[in-house]
């Protein structure tokens, strides 16, 4: 009986290892194919020049600069707003239907297609607020797109911190704000940063919001 259990356990572990190695192998195969096919055409001129001949040749410098600007702008918007929202929901908001409703709405926002955010950003930032097709409009739109993930990650990171640390800090005379700033946030910050990186990784690959709010193919002269 024991040998049978060990056998089934070893088979299960072997399958898990095989599946894990298969996933890693596929990932490395894709990366290897991309590097093999691209190493011959990627050079310094390709990375530092603008596209030419109707986007059929030239370089990708505007795309690189635009991506970094959009990521920085969206992080500047999503990080403080998302972290403060997560702190409020976990540390200050009374437990009740209001918080549950906000959580449901936040989860629903995470599932909205990016094209909806793009249309919303075009209507609000580009047209109504008259930002035009700009980095600012695109950054705010991508910030809204990444906001639900940052909020949920912040809330879950703060939930994982034991209440004994909060109680110990308060027992030493610290205020609630001091406890959050000096005890809770430093402990939860690694997970919060991880959530922000995941959110930025998601929005960096979105095309619909960029197309509707800030699509540009050349750097300003």
Positions of the model-derived regions?
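Transmembrane alpha-helices
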Residues: 75, 176-214
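Interhelical loop and adjacent transmembrane-helix boundary motif
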Residues: 51-58, 210-221
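Transmembrane-helix boundary motif in ABC transporter permease subunits
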Residues: 74-106, 119, 127
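Periplasmic/extracellular loop-to-transmembrane helix junction in inner-membrane transport proteins
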Residues: 1-18, 34-74, 95
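Hydrophobic alpha-helical transmembrane segments of multipass integral membrane proteins
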Residues: 65, 69-77, 81, 85, ...
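Membrane-embedded alpha-helices of multi-pass transport/permease systems
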Residues: 25-28, 32, 80-87, 119, ...
């Amino acid at each position: 009986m024991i040998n049978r259990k060990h056998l089934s356990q070893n088979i299960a572990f072997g399958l898990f290892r095989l599946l894990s190695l298969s996933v890693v192998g596929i990932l490395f195969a894709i990366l290897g194919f991309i590097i093999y096919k691209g190493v011959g055409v990627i050079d310094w001129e390709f990375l530092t020049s603008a596209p030419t001949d109707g986007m059929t040749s030239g370089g990708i410098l505007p795309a690189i600069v635009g991506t970094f600007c959009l990521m920085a702008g969206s992080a500047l918007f999503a990080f403080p707003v998302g972290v403060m929202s997560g702190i409020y929901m976990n540390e200050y908001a009374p437990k009740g239907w209001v918080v549950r409703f906000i959580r449901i709405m936040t989860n629903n926002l995470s599932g909205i297609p990016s094209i909806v955010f793009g249309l919303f950003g075009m209507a609000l930032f580009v047209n109504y607020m008259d930002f035009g097709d700009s980095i600012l409009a695109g950054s705010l739109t991508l910030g809204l797109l990444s906001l639900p993930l940052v909020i949920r990650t912040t809330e879950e990171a703060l939930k994982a911190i034991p209440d004994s640390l909060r109680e110990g800090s308060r027992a030493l005379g610290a205020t609630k704000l001091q406890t959050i700033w000096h005890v809770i946030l430093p402990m939860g910050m690694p997970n919060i940063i991880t959530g922000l990186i995941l959110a930025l990784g998601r929005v960096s690959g979105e095309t619909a919001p960029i197309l509707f709010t800030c699509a540009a193919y050349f750097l300003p002269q």
